[in-house]
């Protein structure tokens, strides 16, 4: 609903105050509707207009005056608050201006990160409701966002710690892009493709980056007429890529996310049908389910599975439409995985399956909502042809309901199932609710399985609303309600906590939905009722009975939970956690029931609870609280009737018991007195107006009991006072009934049954508000004057030292003061007083916004808040000076100070938890299908109340006044006092206060740091610790030690370091050491780079000016004069200069601190750590710090050395001179025209990038005329529009400079590294071991050396050379690692050296590397691998030809044994793999070299060769739009291999275990050669199973028969490597993804092998088949011939002569039936039954001595096949009994007396049937006839088991 237009008066504006509105006010974009329902709604328009006008004016001014901080941030925060309070209550024009301004601000390039994040979050919020602004209203460019993401997420300097970003930044940026995406211009898709396509090189990490960018940036919600500029430009290309990749590289998942979004935004505009089988196959594969008889999962599958959420969105968006294909596949998917949902299954895959169940219905409901109920907006609607039809919905619900019902009892709990059922019931209650109820009724009866009860109730709660409202589809729903309620009552059980809680929730949910009114009388009066209504009417007669029984149950619960054992007096104020939960459950359920009762039932219940409470005396801790809660609930519902009963009774008892004055001084009071006080204090928490009748009695009681000596007594009396004040002064709704106006109308007018499950009507909520009347307010003041005033006078005197008070008296007085304060928080105006000025300079106003919260404060009266403040402060200093150990009083004082500062009627933490529980209840009962806020009335009222509380709590960003300052200083004093508990409580309040007042931290920091000053002698250890805690902050609030502000950290960081010299500091105390550790850790974790440049570009200022000029609403403020703007710019320049000054000052002060003589080492380390945070990418570190870090490279402590290494690497990056680049035209260089369409891979126009040993630059001239391209991915997919390479040597920064040519910073480094002593020491340190056996190649040290050689070229080589030569020859682990790090740095650092220098370098390096590579050991070969890989990464291979030629010399020379050979290959592989597609020549050379060596003897070399082959063939991918590779190709290689394996393939016998491994002398026969070759080939196939992007299936198929022959059947470790590998390899190959065209090929191989003479091969075909079919389920299902072939294959193998093969065929059959790949049709059944009837030959009389035939007769085999087939059918439904099952079991049982192995098979089948059906036998029994049951019972417990 749009708001009615507002009338704007034309009165003259008051200067500066009221907002000016034009003659017709604006139309708000979207308000928060709940504001309209507040009792003071009429005042809000004026209030919000004023605020909006102020925000527009001041935000605009701040930006124009270049004041990002404090002005800009202050007013953007105000805008966030405004949105939280009023929604998007501004005109469309303002909305667009706000967005544009923030977009400009976010994209300021040098903006400080924390500001950027703040602006981004607000911008996300402004863009959140995209239906409010169409593409016509708003257009946002995409490039600024791309620059932002590139700069931050792909930062080039973050890894060197020159930038610190917060962890949250990634999500914020991605959400920001997502929010702006709908508004990108139409041409942006083409621009993005042009920008990121060149990155798409599948072997490179850039692929991941390209696809990530596509996923988050590509716009998919363009209108249909622009589709040709949108997804049509990339859809075929990317889906082609997705369909053809294998093995889930990480980016495949991101493609899925992109397609899911595309599908959702364009339902009906894309034909997905061709891809559906592939999509479902992949989704099924990505669930990683364990399948088949040999379960080896490819390890890579586990890490990169699809995100289920996106897969679900994709499926949902493709549903519907004419073809219904998706629904068919979805049904297939659930059929195939249903059995995994059975509660007896558990595994790491279960979570995914549950998430699938939970998300799918939710997603379908959202789609239905969008298609049928959502208000149309500018977003493309779904075309009629593709909307989901009713039939679609029914099919969907039917296919998912089975798994959901199974999941109800899952091991992980019933939560997901309940959420799924809730959504399914919205769509098809008639299909969903009956089966749930079927499971619920028995669960309510069972005593032995409480978890069933919990699970079913949870699910019924989910469907409650659909059940009760009884739609036309499921009219009988409501009739179940009463039986369910009555049966749930026994669940209120004192002995079972969780059962109790779920029952409360269950009863509470149903009573909220249904008026508990007895309508049975209507039957006589009306005759127009339907049958169901009649049934309901007569049932409602039971309501009264239900309520009374429920109360009896609760009374039982209460009596059993009485506090029998006396707990220790001190801490028993608290209930145990469980007790308090039960208390909460009980009281909220009871109050719901009474709210929903008719007057008649209520009166009965009231009488009952009254009688119960007055006839017992309860202890006040547990039982008393519960009873009092029940009474309070009753009184709240009908205050008049209830107070009449309770108040006189309690008043009587209390007056009676306190007649005698002795009572006042008793330490222990009478139980009855305490109980009545407790009862009275609870029942006064009701509508204040109703209490006024009893004020005399209540005041009398307060006078009698407030000053009791007994603490328990006066505390209860204070509660009474507190509740009286609250009830009379707060604003709150007085009833939460589900129908406005309640149910007390005669049945002739009102028929409650019609209101079952009815939602509240937001526009006719009819909230009954309690707004304090003048009478109530004066009563509240009367209470304060009578009870608060005297206490304040006493405490005032005590604080002045004029009156001695005992501690107990002080405590009592404080308790009364505190109760009054929190009772009247709403009544007392906030603290006044002058503000603390001069904390921050600002040119815009930073004024507070005042919100009206329903009460006009009476300012003529004395403000008790201020009186309390002054009295308490005086008292506090008195106590701290005289009796600091009176901790109880101090605790209360801390509470009082906190409430004085913040409490205006509600507490933040209570509000937060209520907001949370509101959201939970909303979720559990919402109707997502219809949307439109159709919540039940109570929930809507609650939401309005929360809106009111939100307003009372919006005090953050308050003005910081003197009085606040005083109180915060008091808190600081308490936070550093002697008692740890006092400190702890005070610190929590202190942190809350710091967060509430603007800029107060700057005022407080110096005071905290006072305690850390090293020159103070009077600081105690407690004060020191307290101060440190104050700096540390709590986990949520401010951390003073690390405010993102130069002015603050310039004080705190140096103070932390110097505090190490304070005499209060003691490193012996572990608590202090831990504090410093925590502080350092927190600073490092939370530090974000602080800005040095706060300039605002012109583009922002222009929009800011528009914002200030925007009318409706606006305040009359003059526009800024040019002088003002100049002044703003001047100030901003000063601020930049200030920041820089502060930065340098901080570095220097920290250095001073660290260099103090006797500073303990811990503080030195902390200081150096802080210094290292100050490295930046926009300023070089000051010289003194550079000198410091370089010196510390040789510090004694390894921690310091590590920090110094990082820092110096960063400094070298800062000092890096920029290298000039120029644009080239790759087509000119190659002399080829530009290709017309995209073709990736090896093309003529990128051939010049390849390594070609004929054209390698070997002379200076060739070198300088070559065009080098360093990054490996350029040119593979296509060329970028603007291809940039480094310019020639003469244009680059000068090399070989003398010391004089360098800047001072460089000289510092130059001097140290030219000094042989320094270098020697450095190398000694670097070659020490750090953590034994766990050290790895260190990227930090590599960066250090790379920087040294990049910035100073070969200046230091002479000094280093002797060290390198020495280190290389030393085979110790740490020395080898050190030299590997230096060499990698050298090779990478020499990227820009001149040819002469490079040539000299390789003359030095080649001999070094040869030595190193022959000295590798087990510990170091990894490091050399990393070294070479790092050296080659992103480098042009032509520049490294020395290295590659060296590596290829002869890797398998045999020098140093097989181990060194394997290592050399490993290192070579590392280098070549980094070069990807650019070194085909080298790959061919390597393959040629390796091929004759494939028959290697040594296992480690074979494994390594296998892995190297994977990398050699990695480039041979079959991706779409990709040219055939010039690198080695798999088919040619496989052909050559098969030729050599002929001797093995031709032979038909088994290949035996071959152990004749080592060195057979002389020529081996071909066969032995073949076996060795095969071992290597197996290693290759296993290595590539998880790595390559596409499997060359055709080639592998030719090897399959051979593997089938070798693979063993049993798992036996005595087999040799060959057999084990063959088995593993088959398992991995069977999990591979197949393309449709490969299916016939593979089936041909399988059926050929199934005729093999080796039964091992036949057996293995079956295990292979199981896995292959499941992992490619829909690809096979999509091909009818394939299904037929497989079925035929299995049926043939069922009749195999080998018993094991027959049994495995049966297992396979049952598995394929179970996942619904095959169906049990009559043809199959008849076939098996025929086989079973095969006549067996007569038994011959055997001679006693002769052995029976070992070969079974053909007849026996046939008959066995039939029995196995039937058995497979039985076992294929392990969890239910289909209609055909009983007869099959009967047929089977006929064979129990057949000869073996038939008898055994039948027994096994029966015992399995019994095992799987035992759990739900009661249910399954129904499927059998009585005769069948008799036979079955006989069989299942037949004596033959025991015979």
Swiss-Prot record:
GO biological process, one term: sperm DNA condensation
Location of the protein in the cell: Cytoplasm, Cytosol; Nucleus; Nucleus speckle
Record family assignment: Belongs to the BLM10 family.
Description of the deletion phenotype: Mice are viable and show no obvious developmental abnormalities. They have reduced male fertility due to defects in spermatogenesis in meiotic spermatocytes and during the maturation of postmeiotic haploid spermatids. Testes are defective in core histone replacement.
Post-translational modification comment from the UniProt entry: Phosphorylated.
Signal peptide range in chain numbering: none
Originating gene: Psme4
Protein's recorded name: Proteasome activator complex subunit 4
């Amino acid at each position: 609903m749009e708001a009615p237009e507002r009338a704007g008066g034309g009165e003259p504006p008051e200067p500066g105050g009221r907002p000016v509105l034009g003659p017709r006010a604006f139309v708000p974009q979207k308000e928060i509707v709940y504001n309209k329902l507040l009792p003071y709604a009429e005042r809000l328009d004026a209030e919000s207009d004023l605020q909006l006008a102020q925000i527009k004016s001041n935000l605009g001014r701040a930006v124009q005056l270049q004041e990002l901080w404090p002005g800009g941030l202050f007013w953007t925060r105000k805008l966030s608050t405004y949105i939280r309070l009023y929604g998007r209550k501004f005109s469309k024009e303002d909305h667009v201006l706000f967005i544009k301004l923030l977009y400009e601000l976010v994209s300021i390039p040098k903006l400080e990160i924390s500001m950027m994040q703040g602006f981004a979050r607000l911008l996300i919020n402004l863009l959140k409701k995209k239906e409010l602004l169409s593409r016509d209203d708003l257009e946002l460019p995409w490039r600024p966002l791309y620059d932002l993401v590139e700069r931050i997420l792909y930062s080039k300097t973050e890894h060197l710690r020159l930038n610190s970003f917060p962890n949250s930044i990634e999500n914020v940026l991605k959400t920001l892009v997502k929010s702006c995406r709908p508004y990108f211009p139409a041409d942006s898709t083409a621009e993005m493709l042009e920008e990121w396509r060149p990155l798409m090189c599948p072997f490179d990490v850039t692929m991941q980056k390209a696809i990530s960018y596509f996923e988050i940036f590509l716009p998919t919600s363009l209108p249909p007429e622009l589709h040709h500029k949108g997804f049509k430009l990339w859809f075929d290309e990317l889906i082609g890529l997705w369909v053809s990749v294998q093995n889930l590289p990480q980016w495949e998942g991101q493609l899925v996310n992109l397609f899911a979004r595309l599908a959702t935004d364009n339902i009906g505009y894309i034909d997905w049908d061709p891809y559906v089988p592939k999509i479902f196959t992949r989704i099924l594969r990505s669930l990683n389910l364990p399948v088949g008889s040999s379960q080896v999962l490819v390890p890579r599958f586990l890490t990169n599975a699809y995100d289920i959420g996106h897969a679900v969105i994709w499926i949902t968006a493709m549903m519907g439409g004419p073809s219904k294909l998706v629904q068919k596949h979805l049904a297939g998917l659930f059929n195939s995985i249903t059995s995994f949902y059975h509660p007896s299954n558990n595994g790491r895959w279960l979570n995914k399956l549950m998430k699938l169940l939970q998300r799918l219905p939710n997603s379908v409901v959202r789609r239905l909502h969008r298609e049928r109920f959502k208000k149309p907006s500018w977003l493309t609607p779904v075309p009629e042809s593709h909307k989901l039809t009713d039939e679609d919905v029914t099919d969907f619900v039917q296919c998912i309901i089975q798994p959901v019902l199974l999941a109800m009892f899952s091991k992980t709990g019933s939560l997901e199932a309940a959420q799924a059922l809730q959504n399914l019931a919205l769509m098809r209650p008639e299909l969903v609710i009956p089966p749930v109820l079927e499971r619920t009724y028995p669960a309510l009866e069972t005593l032995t399985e409480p978890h069933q009860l919990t699970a079913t109730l949870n699910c019924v709660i989910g469907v409650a609303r659909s059940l009760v409202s009884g739609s036309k589809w499921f009219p009988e729903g409501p009739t179940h309600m009463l039986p369910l309620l009555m049966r749930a009552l026994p669940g209120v059980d004192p002995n079972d906590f969780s059962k109790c809680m779920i029952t409360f929730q269950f009863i509470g949910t149903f009573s909220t939905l249904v008026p508990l009114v007895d309508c049975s009388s209507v039957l006589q009066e009306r005759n127009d009722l339907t049958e169901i209504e009649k049934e309901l009417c007569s049932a409602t007669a039971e309501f009264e009975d239900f309520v009374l029984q429920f109360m009896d149950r609760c009374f039982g619960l209460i009596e059993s939970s009485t506090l029998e054992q006396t707990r220790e007096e001190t801490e028993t104020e608290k209930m145990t956690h469980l007790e308090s939960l039960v208390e909460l459950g009980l009281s909220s359920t009871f109050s719901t029931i009474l709210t929903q009762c008719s007057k008649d039932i209520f009166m009965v219940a009231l009488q009952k609870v009254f009688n119960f409470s007055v006839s017992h005396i309860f202890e006040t801790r547990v039982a008393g609280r519960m009873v009092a809660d029940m009474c309070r609930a009753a009184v709240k519902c009908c205050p008049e009737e209830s107070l009449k009963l309770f108040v006189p009774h309690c008043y009587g008892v209390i007056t009676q018991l306190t007649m005698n004055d002795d009572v006042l001084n008793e330490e222990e009071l009478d139980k009855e007195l305490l109980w009545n006080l407790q009862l009275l204090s609870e029942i006064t928490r009701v509508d204040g107006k109703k209490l006024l009748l009893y004020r005399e009695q209540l005041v009398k009681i307060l006078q009698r009991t407030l000053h009791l000596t007994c603490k328990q007594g006066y505390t209860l009396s204070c509660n009474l006072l507190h509740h009286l004040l609250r009830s009379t002064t707060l604003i709150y709704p007085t009833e939460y009934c589900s129908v406005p106006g309640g149910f007390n109308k005669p049945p002739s007018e009102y028929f409650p049954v019609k209101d079952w499950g009815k939602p509240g009507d937001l526009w006719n909520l009819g909230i009954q508000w309690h707004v304090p009347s003048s009478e109530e307010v004066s009563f509240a003041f009367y209470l304060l004057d009578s009870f608060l005033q005297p206490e304040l006078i006493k405490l005032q005197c005590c604080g002045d030292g004029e009156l001695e008070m005992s501690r107990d008296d002080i405590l009592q007085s404080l308790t009364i003061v505190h109760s009054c304060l929190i009772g009247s928080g709403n009544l007392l105006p906030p603290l006044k007083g002058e503000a603390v000025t001069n904390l921050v300079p600002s040119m815009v106003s930073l004024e507070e916004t005042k919100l009206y919260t329903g009460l006009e404060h009476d300012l003529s009266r004395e403000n008790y808040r201020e009186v309390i403040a002054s009295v308490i402060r005086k008292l506090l200093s008195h106590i701290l000076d005289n009796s600091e150990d009176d901790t109880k009083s101090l605790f209360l004082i801390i509470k009082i100070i906190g409430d004085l500062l913040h409490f205006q009627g509600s507490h933040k933490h209570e509000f937060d938890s209520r907001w949370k529980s509101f959201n939970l209840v909303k979720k559990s009962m919402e109707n997502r299908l219809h949307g439109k806020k159709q919540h039940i009335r109570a929930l809507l009222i609650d939401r309005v109340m929360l809106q009111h509380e939100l307003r009372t709590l919006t005090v953050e960003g308050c003005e910081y006044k003197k009085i606040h300052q005083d109180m915060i200083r008091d808190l600081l004093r308490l936070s550093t006092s002697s008692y740890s508990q006092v400190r702890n409580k005070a610190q929590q309040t202190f942190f809350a206060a710091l967060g509430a007042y603007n800029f107060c931290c700057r005022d407080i920091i110096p005071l905290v740091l006072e305690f850390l000053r090293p020159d103070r002698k009077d600081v105690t250890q407690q004060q020191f610790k307290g101060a440190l805690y104050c700096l540390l902050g709590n986990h949520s609030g401010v951390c003073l030690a690390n405010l993102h502000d130069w002015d603050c950290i310039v004080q705190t960081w140096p103070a932390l370091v110097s505090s190490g010299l304070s005499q209060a500091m003691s490193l012996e105390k572990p608590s202090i050491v831990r504090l410093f550790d925590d502080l350092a850790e927190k600073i490092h974790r939370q530090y974000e780079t602080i800005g040095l440049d706060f300039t605002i570009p012109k583009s922002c200022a222009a929009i800011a000016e528009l914002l200030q000029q925007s009318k409706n609403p606006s305040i009359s403020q003059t526009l800024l004069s040019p002088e003002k703007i100049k002044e703003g710019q001047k100030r901003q320049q000063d601020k930049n200069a200030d920041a820089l000054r502060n930065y340098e000052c901080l570095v220097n002060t920290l250095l001073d601190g660290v260099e103090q003589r006797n500073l303990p080492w811990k503080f030195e380390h902390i200081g150096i750590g802080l210094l290292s945070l100050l490295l930046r990418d926009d300023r070089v570190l000051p010289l003194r710090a550079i000198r410091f870090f370089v010196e510390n490279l040789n510090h004694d402590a390894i921690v310091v050395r590590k920090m110094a290494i990082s820092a110096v690497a960063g400094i070298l990056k800062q000092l890096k001179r920029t290298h000039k680049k120029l644009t080239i035209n790759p087509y000119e260089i190659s002399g080829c025209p530009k290709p017309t369409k995209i073709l990736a891979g090896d093309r003529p126009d990128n051939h010049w990038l390849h390594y070609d040993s004929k054209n390698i630059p070997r002379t200076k001239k060739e070198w300088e005329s070559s065009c080098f391209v360093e990054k490996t991915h350029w040119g593979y997919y296509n060329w970028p529009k603007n291809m940039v390479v480094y310019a020639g040597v003469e244009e680059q920064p000068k090399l070989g400079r003398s010391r004089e040519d360098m800047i001072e910073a460089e000289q510092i480094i130059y001097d140290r590294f030219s000094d042989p002593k320094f270098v020697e020491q450095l190398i000694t340190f670097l070659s020490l071991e750090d953590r034994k056996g766990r050290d790895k190649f260190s990227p930090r040290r590599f960066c250090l050396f790379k920087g040294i050689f990049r910035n100073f070229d070969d200046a230091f080589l002479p000094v280093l050379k002797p060290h390198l030569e020495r280190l290389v020859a030393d085979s110790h682990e740490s020395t080898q690692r050190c030299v590997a790090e230096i060499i990698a740095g050298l090779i990478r650092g020499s990227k820009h050296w001149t040819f002469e220098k490079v040539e000299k370098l390789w003359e030095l390096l080649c001999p070094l590397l040869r030595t190193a590579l022959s000295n590798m050991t087990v510990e170091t070969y990894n490091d050399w691998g990393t070294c070479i890989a790092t050296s080659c990464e992103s480098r042009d291979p032509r520049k490294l030809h020395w290295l590659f030629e060296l590596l290829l010399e002869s890797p398998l020379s045999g020098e140093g044994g097989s181990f060194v050979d394997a290592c050399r290959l490993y290192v070579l592989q590392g280098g070549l793999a980094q070069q990807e597609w650019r070194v085909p020549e080298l790959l061919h050379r390597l393959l040629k070299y390796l091929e004759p060596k494939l028959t290697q003897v040594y296992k480690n070399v074979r494994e390594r060769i296998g892995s190297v082959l994977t990398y050699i063939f990695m480039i041979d991918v079959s991706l779409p739009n990709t040219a055939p590779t010039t690198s080695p190709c798999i088919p040619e290689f496989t052909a050559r291999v098969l030729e050599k394996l002929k001797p093995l393939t031709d032979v038909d016998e088994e290949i035996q275990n071959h152990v004749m491994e080592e060195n057979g002398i002389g020529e081996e026969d071909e066969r032995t050669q073949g076996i060795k070759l095969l071992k290597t080939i197996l290693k290759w196939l296993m290595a590539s199973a998880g790595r390559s992007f596409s499997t060359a299936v055709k080639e592998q198929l030719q090897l399959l028969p051979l593997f089938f022959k070798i693979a063993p059947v049993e798992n036996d470790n005595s087999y040799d490597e060959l057999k084990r590998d063959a088995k593993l390899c088959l398992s991995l190959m069977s999990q591979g993804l197949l393309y449709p065209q490969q299916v016939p090929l593979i089936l041909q191989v399988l059926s050929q092998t199934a005729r093999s003479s080796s039964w091992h091969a036949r057996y293995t075909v079956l295990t292979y088949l199981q896995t292959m079919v499941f992992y490619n389920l829909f690809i096979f299902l999509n091909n009818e011939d394939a299904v037929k072939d497989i079925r035929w294959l299995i049926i043939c193998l069922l009749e195999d002569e080998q018993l094991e093969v027959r049994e495995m065929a049966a297992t396979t059959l049952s598995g394929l039936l179970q996942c619904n790949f095959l169906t049990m049709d009559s043809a199959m059944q008849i076939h098996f039954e025929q086989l079973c009837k095969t006549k067996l030959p007569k038994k011959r009389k055997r001679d006693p001595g002769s052995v029976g035939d070992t070969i079974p007769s053909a007849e026996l085999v046939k008959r066995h096949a039939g029995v196995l087939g039937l058995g497979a059918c039985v076992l294929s439904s392990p969890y239910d009994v289909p209609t055909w099952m009983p007869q099959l079991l009967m047929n089977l049982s006929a064979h129990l007396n057949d000869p073996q192995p038939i008898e055994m098979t039948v027994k096994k089948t029966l015992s399995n049937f019994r095992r799987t059906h035992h759990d739900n036998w009661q249910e399954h029994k129904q499927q059998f006839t009585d005769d069948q049951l008799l036979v079955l019972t006989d069989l299942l417990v037949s004596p033959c088991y025991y015979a």
